Every structure is written in C-alpha cells, then in structure tokens.
Amino acid sequence: MWKVFQEARLICGLVRANTVTGVPAVTRLFSSTSAGGDGGEPFLAYEKDPGPAFMREDVQQLLKSLTRLELDKVFRKRSVKDNTVEYRFMTDDQLRQELVQSINRAQQMLQMPPVVQAQQDSCRIVSKDGALKALSTAKFVFTDITYGLKNNQRSIVVRHPDGTLQEAPYEMRKRLNQIYFPLNGRSIHTSPMFQDPYLQQLLESGRYEFVLDRACVQYEPYEQEYHQLTARVYQHVNESRAFDALRSTRHFGPFVFFLAWHRLVDDLLLDILKKDYLRNGVELIVLLSTLHGNELQLDAEMKALILEPEMPALFETQEKSIEQLEQDQQFLAVIERYVNAHGTKKVQLNLAIQAYRELANEKLELARGIKRMHGES
C-alpha cells in the first residue's frame, strides 16, 4: 500500500506540472466606506488594474503553489444537504486512478476568483426628448429580455420624467437581471450578513471562507462592494494571523495577491517560517518582485527551481532528506536577504530566522551522522 502512495506522489507531480496555467509600485488608497455602506474600518483598494498582473502565468503558478493543495482540507465535510461518506474496496490500480481524479477535482475546486479592477458606473445619456417632458412623474425602465444574452450585454435604459433616455445604473441593471434571469444563491437585496454588526461577528468567529464564498455568489468580481468586502476580510485575516483559515482554499491565492500588492507580507512570511514552508517564503518574495519590480535579485538557478511545479502536499510530511535540508538553507538565505533589505518587522523575522537556522543545523547534522553510521557516502 505504501508503494501505491509513493507512486501517487509521482502522479501528483505530473498532474501538477500539466495543469499549471511588470507592474509598478502602487499607492495605498483608504476609504471609510464599508461593504454595507454604513461606514467603518478603512480598506485598501487597487489604484491600478490588477487584472493583467493577476492573470500572468508565472503569478498564477506562484499563487497556486502558495495555496498548498491538501486533499484532506479540500474534501473535508461541509454543511450541505448531502454529506454522506462512501467506502469502497479498490485494487492498487483503481486507487491510483482515484487519486488522480481526486487531484483533478481538488484543483478545480481551488480555482481562484479573479482579481480585476473595480468597475466605474457610467450612465451614458442616449437621447434627450423634450417633447416627453412632464408626460409622467415616474421613471420608465426598458429591459431587453432576449434569451441567450449575457447580463452585461443586455440593454437596459431608463426614461426620466424630463424626457432624458439614459443607460440604467449598475445597481438597477443587476436587480433587473436577477428578476428576469435569477442566479441560484443570489438575492435581489444585499444580505444582512454583509453589514455590521453581523459581518464583524462572522469575522471575529473566523468564518472567513464562508463570507468569501457568499461574496462570490452575491457579487461580481468587478463590483465595488466585492472589493470593499474582500479587502476587509483580507485585512482581518492578516491582523488576526489566521492564515490557516484560508490556506488550501480557493481564496488563499487572491488573499496573498492582495497582501503582496500592498506590501503587507511580513506576518505571512513569519507564519511561513514557523510552519517550515520555506519554499513558499521564496515564492512570496518572487511574487513581490514580479509585482513591484526587482525587490531582490535571484540567480537563474534559484528562480528556475522556484518556478518548477511542486508536488501537492497530499500526505503527512516525513523527515526531510539531506538534500532537502541543504536546499532549505538556500531558501533561508534568500528570505534573510529580503528581510534585511525590505522587511518592516525585521526584529520578529530575524528572530524566527535565527531559531529556524539553529534547528535546521541540528537536523542536518543528525541526518549526516545517521548517513555516516549506515556507511553511506
């Protein structure tokens, strides 16, 4: 059975390799408008369109690797109607096939919501007909309900009492599209869970994934409310250092992208050091370098190693080999150079680096001693 698991790990690497798909520095923008529109904590917004940077193949590869695919978490029990567990007896070949299918399903479930620029509402005036002025005191809305059109392609216009014919504002378009062509799970009116005090209660209880999943259903990625809500959730996760709540979920990639875009990665880097995810730490630095220019120069061999697809963490981690421990020392040196040059929490990070280096040196000496005892060269 263990042989099957070892072969499955190789299969995982092949699947990962076959399915992997310069932005200048920006200014932090603050607003006092909350997702519910009632005012609240300030949030960070994207000054420029983040879409081109987010969609880059190398950025997507880095974000997927940072997400860390873990089958136990992806396929954990959820609060749904049908949550039964099925047990089957399988041969070794059937188990290999099932593992490959599970990895493919997990990668589909971890597909990241896109990060795009917030849409600006522009209501173009189609015409002004003075002859219709004072014909009625009410507004008339005309909607093209032709079957097969996308919601953003549908013509919706408003006739005002003064005779002006104008394109409908986005909120009205969204409401009418939901009335004529309802999307499952989306409501016409904003749910109270996106407003205080309910939103704050959900954040304090750590229901980050639940809030973000509901936000993906209720809003489009280009809506201003979606940007405000996700920014607030991301900031709360970062301040609470609850990174494991989003790790190995479809929201971890956009979350890391948000932190890297706004240069708020020190707490995440500290968490990566504590959890011995050094490769992810270097990937985070490479992501920063990609978004903000050459933050840190990496040699070609190191960069090629980082951009090489990594095997998903499907099973419990075993003791690292000597080669892996030596590679971790190289990763740690890269992280230390970044911390000394660009870190904002240098004291905490340097202490974590020092503690990790001492422990890693002990493990490396122990591994080399065991190898010498076994007479291996």
Language-model segments: residues:
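A basic, Ser/Thr-enriched alpha-helical scaffold prevalent
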Residues: 1-377
